[in-house]
Amino acid sequence: MAGAKEIRSKIASVQNTQKITKAMEMVAASKMRKTQERMASSRPYAETMRKVIGHLALGNLEYKHSYLDERDVKRVGYLVVATDRGLAGGLNINLFKKLLADMKEWNGKGVETELALIGSKAVSFFNSVGSKVVAQVTGMGDNPMLSELIGPVKVMLQAYDEGRLDKLYIVSNKFVNTMSQVPQILQILPLPPAEEADLKIKSWDYLYEPDPKTLLDTLLRRYVESQVYQGVVENLASEQAARMVAMKAATDNGGSLIKELQLVYNKARQTSITQELTEIVSGAAAV
């Protein structure tokens, strides 16, 4: 059994670690509230944009944009949104597992895949497994700007425009609540039709100002940008929630470990005292 001094040192070490995890939990909780506000403010725009695009996909358009046409699928692209920092539980690895399963399914059909990565955890993971990475951005911080995301988005849109990609997906975590974050893979291009039943039974038509091509070229790029930005802010909220939960679990586990070490320490002290008393009694008897 370890000595009492060694056990006291372990208890002090766990207590110091517990203070750190508690502080990180509180910081994550504060950041989560801020990111939730940002996510909530951008979500209506992204959802409305998605509905408008759904209408367009079902409509009788004067100008047929290439983003609306289904193609024979030979190569698929993914915009992957992960975190820059760790200590977020299984948030990233669950997302990566879901993506790898989807990529394996496409590869089984003879379809190639390539990735544009947002977040250092995605960069390190997919480079280590040998995936084809065509663009990457890291160091987004806690307040990501759309201008910082444009690089990977432009690379994938250019590949789609030139016919080097036939489908484009965004891969990120959807924030449900503090305890639940769901990895999801959403199709961006070609534009998915609206899913609502009442929209499918209607025939949509539009009048354009100034002209269909100018309007659709701008609108469809704004749509892609809005979906990527929303994916980033939702993933950021998911990151802070997962980190808060992970740090709380670590703090609670630290408390349990301290109790166990305290019990071991008490037993060690008891053994030491008993041994000292025995030695005193033995010495007295010898005299």
UniProtKB/Swiss-Prot annotation:
Role: Produces ATP from ADP in the presence of a proton gradient across the membrane. The gamma chain is believed to be important in regulating ATPase activity and the flow of protons through the CF(0) complex.
Residues annotated as signal peptide: none
Entry GO CC: plasma membrane; proton-transporting ATP synthase complex
Family assignment from sequence similarity: Belongs to the ATPase gamma chain family.
Keyword Secreted on entry: no
Keyword Membrane (UniProt): yes
Any one Gene Ontology molecular-function term assigned to this protein's record: ATP binding
Superkingdom of the source species: Bacteria
One GO-annotated biological process of the protein: proton motive force-driven plasma membrane ATP synthesis
Natural source organism: Sodalis glossinidius (strain morsitans)
PROSITE patterns, per the entry: ATPASE_GAMMA
Compartment(s) of residence: Cell inner membrane
Cited InterPro entries: ATP_synth_F1_ATPase_gsu, ATP_synth_F1_gsu, ATP_synth_F1_gsu_CS
Subunit structure, interactors included: F-type ATPases have 2 components, CF(1) - the catalytic core - and CF(0) - the membrane proton channel. CF(1) has five subunits: alpha(3), beta(3), gamma(1), delta(1), epsilon(1). CF(0) has three main subunits: a, b and c.
Sorted UniProt keywords: ATP synthesis, Cell inner membrane, Cell membrane, CF(1), Hydrogen ion transport, Ion transport, Membrane, Transport
Membrane topology qualifier: Peripheral membrane protein
Identification of the protein by name: ATP synthase gamma chain
